[in-house]
Amino acid sequence: MLKFIDSGGGPLIMLERDLLPCWGGIFNIGGVANPHRNRVPFEAPNDYDRACEIRSWIAPLHVSNRAGVLFWGDDPYLALVRQGDATFFAVRPYYEIENLQDHIEFAKENPNCFTKDFEASISSSQLIVFDSASPGWDIRGGRLEIDALPGIYEVSTYWQKIPDAEVVFHKFNLRQGR
């Protein structure tokens, strides 16, 4: 059974655990040294606004001295699925699909369906996906976590739109020859 993130919408962001304090959400850019500082939500500029400016299915977003991965859109459905040690998928169905697992298996078995978007460097092993409006030090709503091997990942996308399903798959594949 897939576990989907519990979110009021998006965009969603995936950060390495040690970058969480560097994400300010609706409060500011770059997190804060003291999370109890008196900040007004949506007071510009803020990290959430930076996230909302991106207009592609998936994109890197600079956070501190590295990059997070942004999942664009207001659709809150996203699950993480592992395929071995070096590959995982973000699965984004756009409505309830009875046979979603069959679509996931199709995506796993057909790597040529994917188009490369960018490369992402992961230096620590734990990744957290959450609503980009939340500050990293106080994530509201749901979150998803997945362990990943450190290294450079090729990030690619496959949009499957057929009569009974519309699903976007983002594949994170660790480059060989790390």
What are these regions (language model features)?
Residues M1-N112, F118, D164-R178:
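Primarily secretory-pathway and cell-envelope proteins
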Residues A79-R82, E145-L149:
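Extracellular and analogous surface-interaction loops
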Residues F89-V91, I128-F130, I146:
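Generic recognition of long tandem-repeat/solenoid scaffolds
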Residues I104-G141:
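Extended, solvent-exposed segments with strong compositional bias
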Residues I128-F130, S156, N173:
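Residues in well-ordered beta-strands of folded domains
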Residues R143-I146, F172:
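Hydrophobic/aromatic beta-strand elements that line small-molecule binding cavities or substrate pockets
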Residues A148-Y158:
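A glycine-anchored, Pro-Gly-centered beta-turn/N-cap motif
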Residues W159-P163:
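C-terminal or internal capping secondary-structure element at the end of a domain, subdomain, or sheet
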